[in-house]
Amino acid sequence: SHAEFLRAIEALRDRVRGDKALTERILHKYSIKNVMGMNLLPLVRFDDPFEIIAHLMVGSEGTLAFLAGVTMRTEREYEHKASAMVYFSDIGEASRAVVEMRKLQDSAGERIVHSAEMLDRKSLASVGDATGEGLTAVLTETKAHTPEELAANVARIGELLGRFTLYVPARFTDDPAEQAKFWALRSGIFPAVGGSRPAGTTCLIEDVAFHIGDLPRATAELQALIARHGYDDACIYGHALEGNYHFIINQSFSTPAEAARYEALMDDVAELVVGRYDGSLKAEHGTGRNMAPFLRREWGDAACAVMRAVKELFDPAGLLNPGVIFNDDPRCHLSHFKPLPLTDPLIDRCIECGFCEVNCLTCGLTLSSRQRIVVRREIARLKASGGNPRLVRELERGYRYPGERT
């Protein structure tokens, strides 16, 4: 029996609900995308301890339990879709348009704009969009169950966009092939930016979220902040309809000055997102070690204490994914940098994102493409440092079959 465990869950539930300020804080934080820290919303939303336990798993990043299987419940797909790449000369104007598009609803009170993906000028340049210099685009999608509903949606969105200054008139298409080209541009940003980065640098992607009303000012300030720290090749893109942006930087950690520049950037990002706008430092991708030092700054003492209590209840020995979400080192994001030694011109372009593995012919047979690259980089690192020649020989010998013959 796990009666004691269940009683502890109920006690945490009651502790949270008995603190009005904390309850309101939790509801406010989850009014936008937020995966920073442990998921506290189940303690507010559910009464049954089993439901609370199941929902605590969401976003726990392996710190509470091992998930052996997941069943996904899919939603019905709309039969009719239309997309447009809407170009603006100014990122602030683009953000204001997104805020207004989010308000559009059908007769049932459902949003008629289903996606509004922001692509700033560097994002567009990375994927070869030549529409114009220095533009910002919003990839906009609407969906419907009938052609008539789709046409009505497109007309309403077009009417709204007519109130804004566009670089060229918006043109929606319901052609699946044309829409696929738009979305291929969107999905190609991360690998394009990473693949063109200076050799030896690390491609880092962060994702933050703002409340939708703050989006125009926050977007411009985030762009200016990144530029102020000298990241001239950085780009901002993402799910603007949800106030959620990704930004990509190419960072060298080869000198103390570069590490200090990165530290200053992250401190300023935290101050902008949390201190100024009370947003989320992590909207989708999980806290990880890079944001763990900023957990208390975002959530405050009371919420962090509950998160710690959840962790200690599930994992009293601290064995599961240590250092992730909770880390007592306030500078843990500035140590143990992963080296990317120069290895081969082709290999040096790899950002180790793993997107290629779904199409890799040898993944599961011997080594995937990414695994081969990791081994090659480790051999190069050991050779460059002059350390452990015995390990170098073992790696080279062991690599021959899985890395070269298959």
Give the ranges of each region predicted by the language model.
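Ferredoxin-type iron-sulfur electron-transfer modules in oxidoreductases and energy-metabolism complexes
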Residues: 326-347, 357, 363-406
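Short beta-alpha connecting loops at secondary-structure transitions
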Residues: 80-84, 203, 253-258, 289-298, ...
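Activity-critical C-terminal alpha-helical subdomain
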Residues: 192, 196, 293-342
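C-terminal substrate-recognition/cap domain of FAD-linked oxidoreductases
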Residues: 34, 42-50, 54-264, 272-280, ...
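Feature representing long, continuous alpha-helical segments
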Residues: 65, 220, 245, 267, ...
